């Protein structure tokens, strides 16, 4: 009897500990062990009583002896119980640990391999010439990763970069784009394999999405659920937005964040919540902010679905812990948040005017359409939410609300959370709040993966409780979905293909219902049904992922690997030569380009750059100087000898034409000299007039206001005049009288502009500017307009590109002309109207003799830089009475600490954008200067 009781107790104990290993609830072990101990004790007590009576028949025993014997017997029985338990538990724990490890391994590998297969089917390198580079990943992120790799491997600073527009803080770029704990992976690849490094990064993040969602489901209820894990990792958001790799960190951290919130609501423990939220904010502060909003909603809905509303004291206590945990998370992530906020202060917060008015952003039927496979529409501003996460989820989500064993308040809380997320996307004002009070530029609804997460969690709950639901109810939901899909087909949505969306949806739904029938109603075929269901999910997610990437390619185009690798290899052959042979601090640019961020990957200190963490003042300065620069980007177009020399652009790389000539080479051959040539048809011209990054000038520069002038030529003349301290304007650029004629349009005047309007909307209209060269030299064009309308240009009868376009609103080099030659520039209207600023001239020529003289005078004030790195400059300079300003072409940033002769001096701002130092109080002679950079926030 004792042995039987011991065995039963051991079995109960193992079952209890099994629950503990799976659910992580040690209190269950204590209760079960106590019950087992009590049962064993009772069994032992019965046996002992019999033994005692037998002994009593032969000898007289005292109560004390009887008590001692009873305790001994009970201890012996307990020993048998726990001995059996331990022997059984040891093997069980090993099996549980092994099973859990395999489950998590597969949760990682399945989405990893499936996404790789999708890219493989798109002929990605090395199986073709494809790449993962698309949109901003192609134009921005790949260059940021290249700069990060260069800094980590070669000792650069994460605080500052000379490769963005004139130079600027780098922590903002790092905080928004590169702070993921996985970004360092790019250091494991050679720079020629940057596209493969990013592919590896995307695959790893996709695998971790599956792993973390698997951990969450295992936390809720242990077991293998590879299909549901795959639905989250390979959801439309994960596949499409993987090009914005910095957002995927929040996606894989969201399940852990939800797990931590559930733990906080159930037990009051907030350490995990603090750590996960901090990691989310550190990985990407922007999406981290959205996850903080989601945390509030999820915590409230989860708490009130699980706990009594009457215990307000408990709710207040847990909520205070949640608040304290959130504050700690913000404090832990301050090392990223503070530099990010500092970076945003350079102009991102003023980048656009946000409309906070309320309106509905989409119809709800449109939202339902986005729950289907192959429903990609666009990532452009008119795009709808990306919420597809599998037909199984769409089928089982309504089923959850029919579950009889789920309490009504849990269903209400789940419904409220879903409605809140949908309405957040649908209501414009709420959506802007989610996006940090700023309307996103393309790529809308950047938090939509949170909806997919909630949807999948509820679908999983319905799946594991499906035994409580009749199959006919599931079939009814399936029939309703079929009807909805047929209705959508009738509406003929442009982005819903009959084959790739409608038929895949119906086919997947039919196969899921068939597989579900065997899972639910045929015990003998249940395993086959589960396998069939898993296969359907894999095939559906593969097809949907492939369709999404194909549609994405049609929308915004994937870049070819060769286009990136060959361009970098070709240009790097020149830039590496220059950097190896010239150790001074200088800027370098090129007239050929792949993207505006090329300087970051080529180790060039240039002026071309594009990023969301923009410096608005520098972008405006470059635009005022005649370069192509606006919005959040600047590009080396509009280069001219005066502007280039003042900004310290010492080398200009140009491309040889197929006929052996060089593009726009006449001016360079005349003023510059060829410094480096390569075998791949590139040449680098050295500008002997390029000034240093720091040089002395007259303090009159502080009074220059570019807003007072209409054209870049006037501004550059005024700036040089102020630098020299001259009273009379130094006319480096001299205007040329022009005459304008027009055909096919009428004229009028509006707000300081001459307006040309087509007389026939379907006819041609042209405006012609005519001038005659008065002096041999280089002639330039700039036409100011506050209302630009793109036009086609012809110069002396030959096509000459466009003007007033997004990139072509800059100085144009018209070429070299002899005295008496005619310049006839014709503008053909592409729109109905054209506006040109009146009371100004549009064509100027460069006085090369005066230019030579002026630049030699300014060069005498160059600072002799003795050492420099990313955050440090040291040098010497000569000061005299005529030069009261140490002028720099370094963007103004309060993070620069400046010392002259060992004494700290305060910097001043010039031209509303550049750093300078007032040196009027210095004595004549040589002085030393030291500059160190550390953002104020650090």
At which residue positions do the language-model features occur?
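Contiguous transmembrane helix-bundle modules in multi-pass membrane proteins
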Residues: 268, 287, 412-429, 438-567, ...
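Periplasmic/ER-lumenal interhelical loops and adjacent helix-loop junctions
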Residues: 135, 139-148, 181, 318-319, ...
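Start-transfer (signal-anchor) and selected internal transmembrane alpha helices
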Residues: 1, 63-124, 317, 321, ...
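Membrane-embedded helix bundles of polyisoprenyl
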Residues: 111-115, 202-216, 223-305, 321-341, ...
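Active-site-proximal, structured, solvent-exposed surfaces of multi-pass membrane proteins
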Residues: 95-98, 144, 730-938
């Amino acid at each position: 009897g004792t042995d039987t009781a011991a065995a039963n107790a051991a079995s109960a104990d193992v079952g209890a500990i099994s629950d503990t290993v799976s659910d992580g609830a040690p209190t269950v072990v204590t209760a079960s062990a106590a019950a087992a101990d009590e049962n064993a004790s009772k069994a032992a007590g019965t046996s002992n009583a019999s033994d005692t009576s037998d002994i009593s028949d032969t000898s007289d025993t005292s109560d004390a002896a009887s008590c001692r014997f009873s305790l001994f017997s009970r201890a012996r029985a307990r020993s048998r119980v726990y001995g059996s338990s331990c022997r059984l538990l040891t093997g069980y724990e090993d099996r549980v640990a092994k099973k859990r490890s395999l489950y998590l391994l597969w949760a990682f590998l399945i989405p990893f391999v499936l996404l790789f297969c999708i890219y493989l089917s798109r002929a990605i390198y090395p199986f073709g010439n494809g790449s993962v580079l698309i949109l901003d990943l192609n134009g921005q992120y790949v260059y940021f990763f290249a700069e990060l790799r260069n800094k980590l491997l070669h000792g650069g600073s994460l605080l500052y970069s000379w490769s963005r527009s004139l130079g600027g803080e780098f922590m903002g770029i790092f905080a928004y784009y590169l702070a993921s704990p996985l970004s360092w992976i790019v250091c494991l690849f050679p720079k020629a394999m940057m596209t493969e490094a990013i592919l590896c990064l995307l695959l790893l993040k996709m695998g971790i999405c599956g792993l973390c969602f698997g951990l969450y489901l295992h936390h809720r209820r242990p077991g293998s659920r590879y299909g549901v894990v795959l639905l989250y990792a390979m959801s439309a958001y994960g596949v499409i937005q993987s090009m914005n790799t910095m957002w995927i960190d929040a996606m894989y951290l969201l399940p852990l964040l939800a797990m931590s919130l559930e733990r906080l609501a159930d037990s009051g423990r907030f350490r995990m919540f603090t750590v996960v939220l901090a990691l989310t904010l550190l990985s990407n502060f922007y999406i981290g902010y959205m996850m903080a909003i989601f945390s509030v909603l999820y915590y409230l809905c989860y708490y009130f679905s699980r706990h009594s509303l009457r215990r307000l004291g408990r709710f207040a206590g847990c909520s205070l812990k949640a608040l304290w945990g959130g504050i700690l998370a913000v404090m832990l992530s301050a090392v990223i948040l503070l530099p990010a906020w500092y970076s945003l202060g350079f102009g991102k917060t003023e980048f656009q005017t946000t409309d906070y008015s309320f309106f509905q952003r989409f119809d709800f039927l449109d939202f339902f359409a986005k729950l289907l496979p192959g429903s990609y529409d666009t990532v452009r501003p008119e795009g709808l939410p990306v919420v597809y996460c599998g037909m199984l989820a769409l089928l089982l989500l309504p089923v959850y609300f029919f579950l009889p064993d789920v309490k009504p308040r849990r269903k209400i809380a789940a419904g409220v959370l879903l409605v809140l997320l949908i309405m957040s996307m649908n209501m414009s004002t709420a959506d802007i709040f989610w996006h940090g009070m700023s309307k996103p530029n393309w790529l809308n609804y950047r938090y939509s993966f949170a909806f997919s997460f909630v949807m999948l969690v509820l679908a999983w709950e319905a799946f594991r409780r499906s035994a409580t639901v009749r199959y006919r109810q599931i079939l009814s939901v399936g029939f309703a979905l079929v009807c909805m899909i047929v209705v959508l087909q009738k509406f003929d949505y442009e982005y819903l293909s009959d084959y790739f969306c409608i038929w895949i949806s119906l086919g997947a739904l039919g196969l899921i219902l068939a597989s579900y029938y065997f899972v639910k109603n045929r015990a003998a075929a249940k395993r086959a049904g589960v396998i069939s269901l898993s296969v359907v999910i894999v095939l559906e997610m593969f097809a949907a992922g492939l369709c999404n990437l194909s549609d994405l390619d049609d929308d915004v185009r994937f870049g070819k690997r060769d286009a990136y690798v060959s361009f970098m290899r070709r240009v790097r052959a020149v830039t590496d030569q220059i950097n190896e042979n010239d150790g001074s601090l200088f800027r370098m640019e090129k007239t050929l380009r792949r993207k505006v961020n090329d300087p970051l990957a080529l180790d060039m200190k240039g002026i071309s750059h594009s990023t969301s963490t923009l410096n608005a003042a520098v972008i405006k300065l470059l635009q005022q100087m005649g370069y192509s620069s606006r919005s959040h980007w600047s590009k080396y177009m509009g280069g001219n000898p005066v502007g280039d020399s003042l900004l310290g652009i010492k080398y200009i790389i140009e491309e040889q034409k197929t006929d052996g000539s060089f593009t726009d080479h006449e001016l360079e051959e005349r003023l510059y000299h060829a410094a480096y040539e390569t075998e791949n048809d590139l040449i680098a011209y050295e500008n002997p007039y390029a000034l240093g990054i720091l040089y002395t000038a007259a303090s009159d520069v502080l009074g220059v206001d570019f807003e007072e002038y209409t054209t870049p030529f006037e501004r550059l003349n005024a700036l040089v005049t102020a630098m020299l301290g001259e009273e009379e304007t130094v006319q480096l650029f001299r205007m040329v009288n022009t005459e304008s004629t027009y055909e096919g349009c009428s004229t009028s005047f509006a707000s300081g502009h001459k307006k040309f309007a087509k007389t026939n909307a379907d006819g041609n209209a042209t405006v012609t500017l005519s001038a005659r060269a008065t002096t041999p030299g280089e002639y330039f064009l700039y036409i100011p307009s506050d209302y630009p309308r793109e036009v086609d240009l012809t110069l002396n009868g030959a096509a000459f590109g466009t003007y007033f376009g997004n990139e072509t609103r800059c100085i144009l080099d018209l070429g070299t002309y002899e005295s008496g030659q005619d310049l006839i520039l014709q503008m053909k209207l592409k729109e109905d109207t054209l506006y040109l600023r009146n009371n100004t001239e549009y064509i100027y020529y460069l006085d090369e003799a005066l230019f030579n003289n002026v630049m030699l005078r300014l060069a005498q004030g160059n600072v002799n830089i003795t050492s420099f790195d990313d955050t440090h400059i040291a040098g010497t300079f000569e000061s005299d009475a005529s030069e009261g300003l140490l002028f720099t072409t370094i963007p103004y940033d309060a993070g620069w600490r400046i010392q002259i002769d060992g004494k700290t001096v305060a910097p001043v701002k010039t031209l509303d954008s550049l750093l300078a130092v007032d040196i009027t109080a210095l004595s004549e002679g040589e002085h030393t200067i030291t500059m160190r950079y550390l953002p104020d926030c650090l």
